[in-house]
């Protein structure tokens, strides 16, 4: 194999690495966006249903809400 063919092969192989990193970065970002910010909890001991939602994550506000939509709106801030 001549040196020019070897050089072209090396350039092609090296060019695949950024494409692989780009694909993995995309999947990491999409997973990060899909993480829930609220966790369903039981606010009433008499009721066995998960009726409330509380903030979770790296910086939780230790707040619980009657609905998941209220929790999501406040916890994302």
From Swiss-Prot:
Signal peptide: 1-22
UniProt keyword list: Disulfide bond, Signal
Gene source species: Arabidopsis thaliana (Mouse-ear cress)
Protein's UniProt keywords contain Disulfide bond: yes
Protein name: EMBRYO SURROUNDING FACTOR 1-like protein 9
Stated family: Belongs to the MEG family.
Highest taxon listed in the record's lineage: Eukaryota
Disulfide-bond pairs as recorded: 38-54, 43-75, 52-71, 55-64
Tissue: Expressed in flowers.
